[in-house]
């Protein structure tokens, strides 16, 4: 409160130097002082705005953007479950007449809330949201929505076995498609594969990756040397596969080694640990 008092005095006097020194005030303290709504109330009100039939699309977008900013805070992200807001969000996402713009924002909210957050992963797992995300991720006619849905799925299943088990049961592995050459799409697919591998690699998954020619695809990304983010992610997945005892064939090793030679000139821009681990994975 003392900092808030100093900030208020500096604000009223127009003392810019003092304002810069003090920094921004704590939002919760401001709300307590001026009687504004707390963040939990703001979250609930945002969803009410989106559910209303009397509100413009623009205002609904603003409400969801504000909601996403709030849930960047871990406590607020966990409050989605505490406030029982997951199901309303999924209901809005699932409605056919919900504008694409809102669906994109909701997928972003899901991905942000569950990212590296076990509590929110568990809460989201209690909903039917994953099924809806997988359906949206299959629609390549709405690229931005597809991309955000893939982001949300990857965030949800990363290092979370119950979520991955549901993903597998819902045949989410069918989302892996190497035919689309859009860089952003490829990056989303590689992120999804990395999230899958964060839960381990059994014989069935090894066989599916063999059949899908994953190592060949990773090698092709390295050989193209066109996008540093894609190269970095591909090297990371090669490293993950090696750590999980994936047995690369001689042909796979040859292709990946050739790709590594192509990208070695980018070493200053790449994760050096992943580069070295990828070399080790295919050297023997």
UniProtKB/Swiss-Prot annotation:
Keywords: Cytoplasm, Repeat, Translation regulation. Gene3D superfamilies: Leucine-rich Repeat Variant. ARM repeats lie at residues 74-115, 118-158, 202-243. It is found in: Cytoplasm. Belongs to the FES1 family. Functions as a nucleotide exchange factor (NEF) for Hsp70 chaperones which accelerates the release of ADP. Required for fully efficient Hsp70-mediated folding of proteins. It comes from Candida albicans (strain SC5314 / ATCC MYA-2876). One of its GO terms (biological process) is regulation of translation. It comes from the Eukaryota. One of its GO terms (molecular function) is adenyl-nucleotide exchange factor activity. InterPro entries: ARM-like, ARM-type_fold, Hsp70_NEF-Inhibitors, Nucleotide_exch_fac_Fes1. This is Hsp70 nucleotide exchange factor FES1. GO terms for cellular component: cytosol; endoplasmic reticulum.
